[in-house]
């Protein structure tokens, strides 16, 4: 039996398509695949550039606090600005119900200025994003065309190569970047920060962000649970050459605080309120921004699933290495292999989000006991707290392995401290030791070994030195 919904879609598709044309950026239709489909049932045309009012706000190392407005139709605005044609350009494009002057965009620019000289352009299309979702999703096409127009102007008037450009788009902004990239041959890079699911997941590549939109496309997924029933705003669909799923890509640590503590945020009431409404979705740009200042703090591991990653089946990095999620993903040697690549990692629950993964194996000695075996690493750059490696029967001669994510890179490991404990009192006061502990950092092939012939009672530290 044909459903009423199917009939309605048929009638929508059968209606004559409409089209609007705008000077310098072309024509836009509401024909398939843009409308009249199961994913995009409503026929909605994008607004005009004048109504959307897109602005290009330039920040540079010379003007990190006050923007200069650039116009894609007026090259003189480039000449009158601090735009440097010998430096890279990174555009940051916001998403639904957001704006180009929101703090997070400028904060991201300022982090860039700490590590490089760069043109940082915040794309403000708030008039086109602060409307109904369906309308905003269609306005994406015009905003993307305007970004492409800006890139074309830079190329035509200043011989500025698109290969020098990165488009960073959050939410709907990721698909704005995709539209711009599809119109700009040779675009260097697009980074999608939790590309939005609704109206885009499952659509043809021409509608959404995809790997053909730039020479390199990387995507960070932080809110990939289904929109219905879990209210996940981001897509689970792989849309880049490298797709990163931190913490599994659905539930970010630190996002399940109670309402009051979430709203009364360290970054202010407004940012806290945003976090309360869409914490997982917003984590993507927070991870990216922090990655700029942590070149090696977001190493990501190829894995079939997050469950496999959490089961310690994807460690250490393969021979080709591991990419860094975020700003330095483009340094990965095999970033544009033919197959889309899926990567996993864990982050912290609040700033600082960076983590360094270690694999540890313990060979026990001493008496048989029940309890937990823990290890802390001490290195040239600092030390970790105690991590639980094994819980159960501590049997001499047995070897137990685990992985953990440390808050810092300890540097060259100089010693390891072993501790065991049990909440149940043992009247025999057994002594347990670690005859050997091996440690490997995820991105390195070297396995470091530490030994001791001693044993200790419960809650007494045992120091192991290189052997």
UniProtKB/Swiss-Prot annotation:
Detected in pancreas (at protein level). Disulfide bonds join 21-27, 109-120, 255-279, 303-314, 317-322, 451-467. Ca(2+) binds at residues 205, 208, 210, 213. This is Inactive pancreatic lipase-related protein 1. Residues 356-467 form the PLAT domain. It comes from Canis lupus familiaris. CDD domains: Pancreat_lipase_like, PLAT_PL. Keywords: Calcium, Disulfide bond, Glycoprotein, Lipid degradation, Lipid metabolism, Metal-binding, Secreted, Signal. One of its GO terms (cellular component) is extracellular region.
